[in-house]
């Protein structure tokens, strides 16, 4: 009987492990790994969609390949900001070259990894938006830079410090349509003073956060609204602090919430997202 109970428990544990693995597979089926250099080959070997940051714009205003390993076929292409000291730029010419490169490599989409909302970037993105739409190639643009575009899919960071992640995503879907909202899974690890005058705290490394937890003996909690963990502590001067952070379990929970909102594409940096590609405890 003891042996039967042991075998029974073993089967239950095995079943739970399989269920967890299948659940993570469901939530990661639309996960796109963002890579540079040699990481691209490693990520592609996992059988996941890959975005390769491999294109830029030269000071002379031409589309150029960055100094990375060979561009992989069937990967999404990533193009970075143009240099601020650019001499001349024909947005339409660069857009046409981008369409050519996407077709040449059979890329399923293009990600404009633009960080600055400048007049030049707005002209470039408008040209990309029309050219890629006409070519039936999806264009992904960070929300802050692409909100005025007509066709691009807007990528929204999950690193929020207030409100509700699902309500935030749902509100944007209501404005732009669900098909035009994607997400960028951006881990957060920040220390805020209370009350906090800004939505951004002081960035903490994982090691610094672990040391702070050990030093203060604080108890972490999970916020369902932010879909992140947090703890509070008092510093030596009696100032209250609030630490908000992600780990593999909260990133997996974010994927689940995004899937529940109907988000079709979620980008995540590799190898930072490697922990999502295995079952969570």
Tell me what each language-model feature is:
Residues 67-69, 74-76, 85-90, 182, ...:
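Mobile, glycine- and charge-enriched loop segments
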Residues 257, 261-264:
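Conserved, well-ordered alpha-helix/loop/beta-strand core segments that scaffold catalytic motifs
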Residues 26-160:
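Chitinase-like catalytic core of GlcNAc-active glycosidases
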Residues 264-281:
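Acidic/aromatic/glycine-rich contiguous surface patches that form carbohydrate-binding/processing clefts
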Residues 1, 9-24:
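Short, Lys/Arg-enriched N-terminal segments with co-localized hydrophobic residues
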Residues 117-215:
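Substrate-binding surface in catalytic domains of secreted glycosidases
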Residues 186-253:
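Glycan-binding loop/region signatures in secreted carbohydrate-active enzymes
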């Amino acid at each position: 009987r003891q042996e039967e109970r042991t075998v029974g428990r073993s089967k239950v544990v095995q079943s739970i492990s399989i269920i967890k693995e299948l659940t993570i597979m469901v939530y990661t089926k639309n996960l796109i790994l963002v890579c540079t250099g040699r990481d691209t080959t490693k990520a592609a070997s996992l059988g996941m969609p890959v975005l390769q940051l491999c294109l830029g714009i030269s000071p002379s205003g031409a589309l150029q390949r960055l100094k990375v390993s060979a561009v992989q076929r069937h990967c999404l292409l990533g193009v970075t900001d143009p240099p601020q000291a650019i001499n001349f730029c024909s947005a339409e010419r660069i857009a046409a070259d981008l369409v050519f490169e996407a077709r040449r490599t059979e890329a399923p989409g293009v990600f404009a990894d633009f960080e600055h909302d400048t007049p030049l970037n707005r002209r470039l993105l408008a040209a990309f938006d029309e050219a890629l739409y006409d070519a039936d190639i999806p264009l992904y643009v960070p929300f802050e830079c692409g909100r005025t575009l007509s066709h691009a899919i807007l990528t929204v960071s999950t690193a929020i410090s207030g409100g509700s992640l699902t309500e935030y995503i749902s509100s944007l879907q209501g404005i732009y349509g669900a098909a035009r909202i994607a997400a960028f899974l951006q881990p957060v690890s920040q220390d805020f003073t209370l009350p906090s005058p800004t939505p951004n705290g002081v960035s903490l490394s994982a090691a610094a956060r672990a040391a702070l937890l050990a030093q203060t003996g604080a108890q972490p909690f999970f916020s369902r609204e932010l879909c992140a963990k947090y703890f509070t502590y008092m510093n030596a001067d009696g100032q209250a602090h609030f630490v908000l952070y992600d780990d593999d379990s909260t990133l997996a929970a974010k994927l689940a919430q995004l899937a529940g909102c109907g988000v079709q594409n979620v980008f995540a940096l590799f190898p930072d997202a490697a922990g999502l590609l295995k079952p969570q405890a």
